[in-house]
UniProtKB/Swiss-Prot annotation:
<protein>
    <recommendedName>
        <fullName>Alpha-1,4-glucan:maltose-1-phosphate maltosyltransferase</fullName>
        <ecNumber>2.4.99.16</ecNumber>
    </recommendedName>
</protein>
<dbReference type="InterPro" id="IPR013783">
    <property type="entry name" value="Ig-like_fold"/>
</dbReference>
<dbReference type="InterPro" id="IPR049171">
    <property type="entry name" value="GLGE_C"/>
</dbReference>
<comment type="similarity">
    <text>Belongs to the glycosyl hydrolase 13 family. GlgE subfamily.</text>
</comment>
<dbReference type="InterPro" id="IPR013780">
    <property type="entry name" value="Glyco_hydro_b"/>
</dbReference>
<keyword id="KW-0321">Glycogen metabolism</keyword>
<keyword id="KW-0808">Transferase</keyword>
<keyword id="KW-0320">Glycogen biosynthesis</keyword>
<feature type="active site" description="Proton donor">
    <location>
        <position position="447"/>
    </location>
</feature>
<feature type="binding site">
    <location>
        <begin position="557"/>
        <end position="558"/>
    </location>
    <ligand>
        <name>alpha-maltose 1-phosphate</name>
    </ligand>
</feature>
<dbReference type="InterPro" id="IPR017853">
    <property type="entry name" value="Glycoside_hydrolase_SF"/>
</dbReference>
<dbReference type="InterPro" id="IPR006047">
    <property type="entry name" value="Glyco_hydro_13_cat_dom"/>
</dbReference>
<keyword id="KW-0119">Carbohydrate metabolism</keyword>
<comment type="subunit">
    <text>Homodimer.</text>
</comment>
<dbReference type="GO" id="GO:0004553">
    <property type="term" value="F:hydrolase activity, hydrolyzing O-glycosyl compounds"/>
</dbReference>
<dbReference type="Pfam" id="PF11896">
    <property type="entry name" value="GlgE_dom_N_S"/>
</dbReference>
<dbReference type="InterPro" id="IPR021828">
    <property type="entry name" value="GlgE_dom_N/S"/>
</dbReference>
């Protein structure tokens, strides 16, 4: 049996009698748990082999351990904060037979977790002596060998079947014992082996196999979140911009009450999460003016990310927005409409934040006695003090945890974390574990536009979702590579595809008209289960502060931006109906909840992109064909990879476009014409993928 040999410094894995290798999903050699959500089909694979011609088989062993989140690190130089201790839920493990794939000695299985918490799995390898015996016996019978030559083989088979019978319930043993008796009865080998080779015996042994040399594989973890961790549509809004205008046409500062009045419109578009930038008091020292001016006018509202003033810090709401009770009412109103509120967690301070007065050790002090402000040379951000996590980690860790738990207690279960790559990685591992141990339903979105090593590393450390480079992927080859990467990293990274943010107005939206807004929405909403947009996208807001910049003109980060959504909708200047339809289609099709099953199909036109998805649980299948040209029609031949759809090359079938309602009869090759003046994409309801094909297509390669 394989096991772990513990040395003085290094742990080595000792090979077993049956070798088990290349197990997946395993993240960083098992250091971190893989990710899944309740109801997600999790594919597992492993290489299982032994010497010679002896048959091997594999069993997937799955166990639910409970809701306690795995702690990857302790708080430095201090006790770990006490958390509620609940006894582990003892659940009988699931034993799932694995099947061999196209590659020899590679076995596949899958399981579907049904509750939030930590699940474990391992792959057990074992010798299959009856399969070995049957295979050899059939070959010898086919070669015409007689009773004398097969005497030992027949007796060996009888012994194996008798052994197997001891592991079968008494009421089901008779066929095995009868087959063993026949093998021991002198006579023609074909007659003696007839019972042993029947499908009835084969099916019985599939349920109750005789296992030799059982080797237990290493155990690995899968953390299972609630479904919103994978599938959801996000809408970002500034509550302060919802106050409308006064009689003179000047913007009025919004409140949680005026923001709540916008919630029915947002829910009506099909969004699941309303994300709020920081709602805390804004610093008054070195406050930024409009369009990021270093000098603020007396009426300028400042940037919400410059958190803290004499009015409070991270655990306080801005007095112009209302009270904490008003915030609670806003959260309740969103919940009543079927939405959640996500809150920005920006761990930085304005110079007049209470922390800067009371805890100078949480910042970096310069030789002249001043606190260092944020810089990205040559840029300077005098209105922001970055935190220093090394001077007093115990105190700062505890305070951030207190802040997060404060907002959890007020109904926030999703945090969008600002620039987590600028904070220590062990801090995030500690914080996420502490929070999720108390409430496993709390989720974290990482806003880290940083190189892959850090972006993916944050996902491994526990971040539920991640921002991505989708915004900058605009060509066919870039989008294809990006989509394939979504599937490749699905074991630990869930991208949330935002089409825009208050910081990012990509050039394709600045210069390609309303059609490109629809195109990017289709791509984001259908390539990933999680997608989002920042308020104003539905109004085609596209003016940059200057040519070559991705900053919005009159950026809402620095001023109030009320909008008249109703008038735009009445005048046909709104993408709202199309976004609503997109989110309806997403909810209709479980295929859009999948990360692993995206598959690209060939279109002989670089301005057209085609990809499909299927749901391994139901077989639901969709195919998206989207144009990348916002100004004119594009046509081409679409060549479907029929095997990837569970079909034969000669199949013909009817499909329905979920955007237009039109129906077509399709086959392997199909003429496509997309005119953005009519619709920027086909979203095709395809025939369901057959059950057998689903299992095969979900296998890891």
């Amino acid at each position: 049996m394989s096991g772990r040999a513990i040395g003085t410094e290094t742990e080595w894995w000792v090979p077993g009698r049956v070798e088990i290798d290349d197990v997946a999903p395993v993240v960083s050699c098992g250091v971190y748990p893989a990710k899944a959500v309740v109801g997600e089909v999790v594919p597992v694979s492993a290489a299982v082999w032994r010497e010679g011609h002896e048959a091997v088989a594999a069993t997937l062993v799955v166990r639910y351990l409970g809701v306690r989140y795995p702690h990857l690190t302790d708080r430095p130089r201090a006790r770990v904060l006490p958390t509620p201790s609940e006894p582990q839920q003892r659940v009988k493990p699931l034993l799932i037979p694995m099947t061999s794939g196209q590659e020899p000695f590679v076995f596949h299985g899958q399981f579907t977790p049904d509750r939030v918490g930590l699940w474990t799995f391992r792959v057990d390898g074992w010798g299959d002596p009856i399969h070995t015996w049957r295979h050899g016996l059939i070959a010898k019978l086919d070669a015409g060998q007689g009773e004398t030559e097969l005497s030992n083989d027949l007796l060996v088979g009888a012994v194996l079947l008798e052994r197997a019978a001891t592991g079968v319930p008494r009421g089901l043993r008779d066929p095995l014992l009868a087959a063993a008796a026949a093998l021991r009865t002198p006579g023609d080998p074909v007659t003696r082996t007839a019972l042993a080779l029947t499908p009835e015996i084969e099916e019985l042994l599939a349920d109750y196999p005789l296992r030799d040399l059982v080797t237990r594989g290493e155990q690995f973890g899968v953390w299972v979140d609630r479904p919103l961790a994978r599938f959801g549509a996000w809408y970002e809004m500034f509550p302060r911009s919802t106050g409308g205008w006064d009689d003179d046409g000047n913007p009025v500062h919004g409140t949680f009450a005026t923001a709540a009045a916008e919630l029915p419109r947002i829910a009506g578009m099909g969004f699941d999460v309303v994300y709020l930038p920081p709602i805390h008091p804004i610093g008054k020292v070195h406050r930024k003016g409009r369009n990021n001016s270093p000098t603020a006018a007396p009426t300028d509202v400042g940037s919400p990310w410059a958190i803290g003033s004499d009015e409070g810090g991270h655990d306080t709401v801005h007095p112009s927005l209302g009270t904490i009770d008003d915030f609670d009412d806003f959260v309740s109103a969103a919940r009543d409409l079927g939405m959640e509120v996500a809150l920005d967690l920006a761990l930085q301070c304005a110079p007049d934040h209470p922390w800067a007065r009371e805890h100078r050790q949480w910042f970096t002090e310069l030789p002249d006695g001043t606190i260092a402000y944020a810089e990205n040379p040559p840029k300077k951000y005098q209105d922001i003090y970055p935190l220093n996590f090394d001077n007093d980690p115990e105190g700062l860790y505890d305070e951030v945890l207190r802040v997060v738990q404060h907002w959890v207690n007020h109904g926030v279960k999703f945090f969008r974390v600002d620039n987590p790559h600028t904070k220590p990685p062990n801090f995030w591992a500690w914080l996420i574990a502490q929070v999720k141990t108390v409430d496993p339903d709390v989720l974290f979105l990482s806003e880290a536009f940083t190189p892959p090593a850090r972006q993916y590393g944050l996902a491994k450390l526990g971040f539920t979702q991640s921002y991505s480079y989708f915004t900058w992927r605009t060509t066919k080859w870039e989008l294809t590579e990006f989509g394939n990467q979504i599937a490749e990293l699905a074991d630990y990274r869930r991208p949330n595809l935002f089409v825009n943010t208050p910081d990012i107005l990509h050039a394709v939206l600045q210069h390609n008209g309303p059609g490109m807004f629809a195109i990017r929405a289709v791509l984001a909403a259908t390539m990933s289960p999680a997608w989002g947009m920042y308020c104003g996208y539905e109004l085609f807001e596209h003016r940059a502060v200057r040519e070559g910049s991705e900053e919005y003109l009159d950026s809402e980060k620095y001023e109030l931006r009320p909008r008249d959504f109703a008038s735009a909708l009445d005048q046909g200047r709104s993408l709202q109906p199309f976004i609503t339809r997109l989110n309806i289609i997403r909810r209709l099709h479980p295929a859009f909840q999948q990360l692993r099953t995206i598959h690209f199909h060939h279109v002989d036109n670089d301005a057209l992109l085609a990809y499909s998805k299927f749901d391994p649980a139901t077989g639901d299948c969709v195919l998206v064909v989207v144009t990348l040209n916002a100004f004119g029609p594009e046509e081409a031949t679409l060549w479907l990879d029929m095997a990837a759809l569970g079909m034969e090359d000669y199949d013909r079938f009817w499909v329905r476009d979920e955007i237009t309602g039109e129906e077509y009869q399709w086959g392997q090759a199909n003429y496509i014409r997309i005119d953005p003046a009519r619709a920027v994409a086909h979203i095709i309801n395809m025939p369901a993928v057959p059950y057998e094909s689903r299992n095969t297509l979900l296998r890891r390669r």
